[in-house]
């Protein structure tokens, strides 16, 4: 039997590069989902992508926006080879999620849709409002959710323009008109038959950044329902469990902006979230 040459050792197992979780939004709102995902999956690697060159999505014609997102994901998948992709944007999810699944069947996609089912389960008064972009409000998908899960509730859809942009200004530390915010959320608050709205669904991932402002401006206390935690749990459920023997190259979490020129405030924000450009 041949002896191994002196000084030789068994070959080390190959350490695979870690496939990241890709979190996508039109701007910085998806950071609310990333934050919860890191709590649920602290050992995973993330790439955060903001389509700031296309922001805000509410200004787009639907077919043009659909084509844009599908084409962008072709580049993202080729560049990052994600283990899973999260559409951390209600507008994009209700528009293009199924098309993305058909276009890229090898990648699991998780969408962000209005949290109407949990709202219907939690409400005591039966009066629920959904605060969203006009695009999310007008989609048949949103109405189907109401019909399927909240048919016994009175659900008011409130579509607002500009609140996502106000959230971006707020997170940058810029001033904004609180009277405008108050006017936009006012239709969410209904009094009917001696009962009041008790849940407002935040159906845009930007809005949780404003939640303290919303609480202060609201005419009475409500549960502002943020779906980020549920999205994070769904992501984890679709990923294979890791064992203690799994080894991966340690790599930084990344941020990519489609404009390729995020300003100083955004760069600071991304660094605060532990994201490298």
UniProtKB/Swiss-Prot annotation:
Presence of the UniProt keyword Secreted in the record: no
Protein name: Glutamate racemase
Family assignment from sequence similarity: Belongs to the aspartate/glutamate racemases family.
GO BP terms in the entry: cell wall organization; peptidoglycan biosynthetic process; regulation of cell shape
Group of enzyme by EC: isomerase
UniProt source species: Brucella ovis (strain ATCC 25840 / 63/290 / NCTC 10512)
Any one Pfam family match given in the protein's UniProt record, by short name: Asp_Glu_race
Enzyme active site: 89 (proton donor/acceptor), 204 (proton donor/acceptor)
Functional description taken from the UniProt entry: Provides the (R)-glutamate required for cell wall biosynthesis.
A GO molecular-function descriptor: glutamate racemase activity
Assigned EC number: 5.1.1.3
Record's keyword annotation contains Cell wall biogenesis/degradation: yes
Annotated keywords: Cell shape, Cell wall biogenesis/degradation, Isomerase, Peptidoglycan synthesis
SUPFAM superfamilies in the record: Aspartate/glutamate racemase (SSF53681)
Binding annotation for substrate: 25-26, 57-58, 90-91, 205-206
Coiled-coil features, chain-numbered ranges: none
Highest taxon, organism lineage: Bacteria
Pathways involved: Cell wall biogenesis; peptidoglycan biosynthesis
Catalytic activity: L-glutamate = D-glutamate
């Amino acid at each position: 039997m041949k002896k191994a040459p002196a000084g030789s050792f068994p070959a080390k197992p190959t350490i695979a590069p870690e496939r990241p979780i890709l979190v996508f939004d039109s701007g910085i709102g998806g950071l609310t989902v990333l934050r919860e995902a890191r709590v649920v999956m602290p050992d995973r690697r993330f790439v955060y992508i903001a389509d700031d060159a296309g922001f805000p999505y509410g200004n787009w014609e639907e077919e043009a926006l659909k084509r844009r997102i599908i084409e962008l994901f072709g580049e993202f998948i080729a560049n990052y080879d994600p283990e899973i992709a999260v559409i951390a944007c209600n507008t994009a999810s209700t528009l293009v999620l199924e098309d993305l699944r058909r276009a890229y069947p090898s990648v699991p996609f998780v969408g962000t849709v209005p949290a109407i089912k949990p709202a219907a389960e939690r409400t005591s008064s039966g009066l629920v409002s959904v605060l969203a972009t006009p695009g999310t409000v007008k989609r048949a998908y949103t109405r189907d959710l109401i019909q399927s899960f909240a048919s016994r509730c009175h659900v008011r859809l409130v579509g607002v323009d500009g609140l996502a942009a106000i959230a971006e200004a707020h997170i940058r530390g810029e001033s904004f008109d609180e009277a405008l915010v108050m006017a936009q959320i006012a239709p969410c608050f209904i009094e009917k038959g001696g009962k009041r709205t008790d849940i407002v669904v935040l159906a845009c991932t930007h809005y949780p950044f404003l939640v303290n402002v919303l609480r202060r401006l609201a005419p009475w206390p409500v549960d502002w329902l943020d779906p980020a935690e549920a999205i994070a749990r769904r992501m984890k459920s679709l990923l294979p469990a890791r064992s203690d023997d799994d080894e991966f190259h340690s790599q930084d979490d990344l941020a990519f902006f489609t404009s390729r020129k995020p300003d100083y405030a955004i760069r600071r924000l991304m660094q605060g979230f532990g994201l490298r450009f």
